[in-house]
Amino acid sequence: MKFGTLKTMVMAAGIAAASATTAMAEWEPNGPIKLMIAFDAGGGVDTSARLLAEELTARHGWEVIPENVAGRGGATMAAALKDEPADGQSIGLTAMDSLAYGVLATQNPGFGADDFTYLSTITGTQAALIAKSDRGWNNLGDVIAAAQAGETITAGAMSAKLADALYLIGEANGIELTTVMVQGGKGGLNGVVADDLDIAWAAGPQTNGVLAGDLVNLVSAIGRPLNASPDAPLLSDYGVEFVFGTMFGVIGPADMDPEAREAIQNAIAEIVNDPESQLSNYITKAFGGPEAITGADFDAFMQAANNEAALLLEAAQ
């Protein structure tokens, strides 16, 4: 069975967003807009949020104040945002997996997917399994062959979802990978570079190393070719029919004022889709490039993500 709905949603909605008009609604905030950031200061998501805040202020005169509310893979921010007023003056940037797989995999996280208004995505990850080039592995098939020959393969994963992915790779190919949990995408990257790990998941920080020839993207986990390694195989080539990348997006509390929702989501999409914007240039270099999915398309994307998360959890039992 193919689980291609999620990646199809991303592509179709991205095309629609790129061709949509960006007329702003007549809404204006009554004070500062708090932009809650689900991750620590200094990382890629934090940088993206701060660039977005700067450009919203510059283009629309809104005072947008970034605030880091990190912890529990995005759950701390989500729990806090849920109880904010739905007037458009409290929004948050997070990884959408935290509101799909994260909700289903965690017992009573303090919120559910329907506790939020989905405004706009900004970009997606370039999730892949990586290895050092000097290992001599060109793709995941080479790693599988090494494991089948008796080699112990240590594999870094920065989330329970990606640990599930390693389990499914092993199950589909008759091998057992030794999973090591790491802190963030750079944890896996650093482990591979230091020879502490044989392979690891990375979601974008590996790109410079791949382009320099020091690292190899062994397999794409996003259901389509990687920007830096368009010839890398897909997980489906090895019997795993799930997508393991994530999108980063801006959300608000449930039942947001309709005029506020329209104005904010359109303003974000305009910045994301503008090739001259600092945000667009940054996410092109650091992530998968601009992907603005808004409104009803974003709602449908999240429904598909939740459906796929349920199937993944069932498959990984």
Residue ranges of each PLM-predicted region?
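Sec/Tat signal peptide C-region and signal peptidase I cleavage site
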Residues: 19-25
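C-terminal lobe and pocket-closing loops
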Residues: 124, 206-281, 300-307, 312
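N-terminal (or domain-start) structured segment
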Residues: 25-115, 151, 161-162, 172-201, ...
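Bacterial N-terminal signal peptides that target proteins for export
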Residues: 1-10
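Short coil/turn segments
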Residues: 40-42, 96-97, 127, 132-137, ...
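Surface-exposed aromatic
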Residues: 282-301
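Hinge/capping helix and adjacent helix->loop/strand transition within the periplasmic-binding protein
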Residues: 27-33, 80-89, 103-187, 235, ...
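Bacterial N-terminal signal peptides
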Residues: 9-19
